[in-house]
């Protein structure tokens, strides 16, 4: 009888230890997951989808609908898209993720309150900003810019010097030229693009995440023919910075 009671006590004790160890392991795993989640840098207007992509949208001024800005592989790219759209809508006083974006984009440097942009144009500007190299969002070196300008201004006939420029510089100049060329295409830009469902919850410019309702049941891609911006807008250009 004594041996049987001892055996029962030992078995119960082992079961308790196993349960305690399992609970401790689960708790540690949960804490580690939460810690990793907290380390992810948060950007205004950007949210991470469950499968890892980053999405962003922005509300059109004086409207309940939102302009879909795209789905991107990194949070930084989505944040650049949001910044470009917000800057188009609110001007230099906008609270941006990357404040120096205005010094690296020729187009964004030249817009003013008299500029008229359609939602489709804003989408295109956002996509260009998102796909730009991250180097574009680092303040340029004054010394390097001075040397580069001297080479172009004082030696315009030195084609061999231009041909020997590093490939990265050529790529940088091409991207800047693409942004500037957008100005000519805004008025006649009729390419089909996707837009978020206008019945979504409210989403303010200064919120870090979208509403907890997770309205993104799909990931529409730019240049899709299934839905057009005309379904939600009357193709009326938006006067910049004319709202609070």
Curated annotation (Swiss-Prot):
Record's keyword terms, sorted: Activator, DNA-binding, Ethylene signaling pathway, Nucleus, Transcription, Transcription regulation
Q: Name one GO molecular function term.
A: transcription cis-regulatory region binding
Q: Which SUPFAM superfamilies match?
A: DNA-binding domain (SSF54171)
What are its GO biological-process terms?
ethylene-activated signaling pathway
| InterPro entries in UniProt | AP2/ERF_dom, AP2/ERF_dom_sf, AP2/ERF_TF_ERF_subfamily, DNA-bd_dom_sf
Q: Where is the DNA-binding region? A: 42-99
The domain of life for this entry's organism is Eukaryota
Low complexity bias locations: 11-29, 157-166
Which Pfam family is one of those matched by this entry?
AP2
Nucleus listed as a keyword: yes
UniProt xrefs under PANTHER family = ETHYLENE-RESPONSIVE TRANSCRIPTION FACTOR ERF013 (PTHR31985:SF163), ETHYLENE-RESPONSIVE TRANSCRIPTION FACTOR ERF042-RELATED (PTHR31985)
Protein's job? Probably acts as a transcriptional activator. Binds to the GCC-box pathogenesis-related promoter element. May be involved in the regulation of gene expression by stress factors and by components of stress signal transduction pathways.
Protein name, UniProt field: Ethylene-responsive transcription factor ERF013
Source organism of this protein record = Arabidopsis thaliana (Mouse-ear cress)
Organism ancestry: Eukaryota, Viridiplantae, Streptophyta, Embryophyta, Tracheophyta
């Amino acid at each position: 009888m004594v041996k049987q009671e001892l055996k029962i006590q030992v078995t119960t004790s082992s079961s308790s230890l196993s349960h305690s160890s399992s609970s401790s392991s689960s708790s540690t795993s949960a804490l580690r997951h939460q810690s990793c989640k907290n380390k992810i840098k948060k950007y205004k207007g950007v949210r991470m989808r469950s499968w890892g992509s980053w999405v962003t949208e922005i509300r059109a001024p004086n409207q309940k609908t939102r302009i879909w800005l795209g789905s991107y592989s990194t949070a930084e790219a989505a944040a650049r898209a949001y910044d470009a759209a917000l800057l188009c809508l609110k001007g230099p006083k906008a609270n941006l993720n990357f404040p120096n974006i205005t010094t690296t984009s020729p187009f964004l440097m030249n817009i003013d309150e008299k500029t008229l942009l359609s939602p489709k144009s804003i989408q295109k500007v956002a996509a260009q900003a998102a796909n730009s190299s991250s180097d574009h969002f680092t303040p340029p070196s004054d010394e390097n810019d001075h040397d580069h300008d001297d080479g172009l201004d004082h030696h315009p006939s030195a084609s061999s010097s231009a041909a020997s420029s590093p490939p990265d510089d050529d790529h940088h100049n091409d991207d800047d030229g693409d942004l500037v060329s957008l100005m000519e295409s805004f008025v006649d830009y009729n390419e089909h693009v996707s837009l978020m469902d206008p019945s979504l919850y409210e989403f303010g410019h200064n919120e870090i995440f979208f509403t907890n309702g997770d309205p993104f049941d799909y990931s529409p891609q730019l240049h899709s023919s299934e839905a057009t911006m005309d379904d939600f807008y009357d193709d009326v250009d938006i006067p910049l910075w004319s709202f609070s």
